[in-house]
Swiss-Prot record:
InterPro entries: FAD/NAD-bd_sf (IPR036188), Prenylcys_lyase (IPR010795), Prenylcysteine_Oxase1 (IPR017046). Glycans are attached at N340. Transmembrane segments: none annotated. The keyword Transferase does not apply. Likely to have oxidoreductase activity. Required in the mevalonate pathway to regulate prenylation and enhances the bactericidal activity of neutrophils. GO terms for cellular component: extracellular region. This is Prenylcysteine oxidase 1-like.
Amino acid sequence: MAHAARLLAALAALLAAAATGDARPSKIAVVGAGIGGSAVAHFLQQHFGPRVQIDVFEKGTVGGRLATISVNKQHYESGAASFHSLSLHMQGFVKQLGLRHRREVGGRSAIFNGENFVLEETDWYLLNLFRLWWHYGISFLRLQMWVEEVMEKFMRIYKYQAHGYAFSGVEELLYSLGESAFVNMTQRSVAESLLQVGVTQRFIDDVVSAVLRASYGQSAAMPAFAGAMSLAGAQGSLWSVEGGNKLVCSGLLKLTKANVIHATVTTVTLQPTEGKPLYRVRYENEAGTGSDNYDIVVIATPLHLDNSSTIAFEGFDPPIDVVQGSFQPTIVSLVHGYLNSSYFGFPDPKLFPFANILTTDFPTFFCALDNICPVNISASFRRKQPQEAAVWRVQSPQPLLRSQLKTLFRSYYSVQTAEWQAHPVHSPHTPLPRFTLHDQLFHLNALEWAASSVEVTAVAAKNVALLAFNRWYQDLDKIDQKDLMHKVKTEL
């Protein structure tokens, strides 16, 4: 099936070239080898064919925000840890690359407010529903209906992309999915939207805020669209990749036969040419500096004012604008040690029943605490008992102080940290950026200013690949079209 899809994509490229008389691009540059850069390299090759040279520039490690840390001779996820069951692009990558889903190891969750647990999961589904109803009435049902309505509309993007449609800006993409309602959700808070559909303030404070803190490190004041995507992840079944999620990135680059250049891109310059534009990409690494010309350039890394490594754009009139915003720092600490269950109200550690702890607005020094499993799980693997030394993943807005570590752990063997600029600080006042920066210069990460997740980035990668393809062959009927639900129903 995958081979047939690649064959059809290559045939489509040949037909488009024949129809327009345009040759395919000879060289494409992708800046960034995270999931966005890896996925867009794969999609670009699907559309333009295998003869196009694709150079992928990466200043760090392939995988970006998909990464692992070794603790006691085992590897654990330190970046994006899991994916929603409806992550169709990620599901497709895993299947195409011959990877496997990691075996699930069950564990109960709870929400902590700094003094006690406001909500505790049990092993019985009906009892969990009863507790939600007893504490919050039907707020959880109203939340579920609201999230499902958003997700049902968002899932339209896969059908649009299957028919070759692309969007030059984030606002155009959102409008195609949910019209003005989706665009307005980027300008209105989660709390405001949920109160409007009858969710209680108490449920927002206790449950919704805890989920948003764990996923985004932000509050219910964040925009509703990003919040809905985050809350969808909390409701669906989750999965991860056996051996580590970053294998998807390295696998896609290997499948694409992309030329990975370990270097920092410093400048993209528009070259004076006749006809289609040409872009000169300058870069530097330990070997020195270099540059090359490209027909298409995709920036698959954040571009915003607070980013000290933002690329300089030269020769463009008007100048290239970067996003007027900042990113939310998230510290992930992997602690190998003994949990201080007394802090959570369990003097006897043997009685502590939870593997995952979310927090409300208090305590402020950590957002979530998880007893995590390694990326490779054997058939005989079992989760550590609460009285045993285990590897705990602590998410916090700042590096944990020694006193804070002593609050959470009776003792510990090691602490290893990863600091991420994990997500944009989502604000109703941040304007929605565009994917198209210039004729054949694109910013893949534009979409994460509306919502940020691995699958959303993969959706953006597919959109940018289609956008580049459609613009190259001037197939403008496939760009920024409205009423697409009607159009795709009438297409063969």
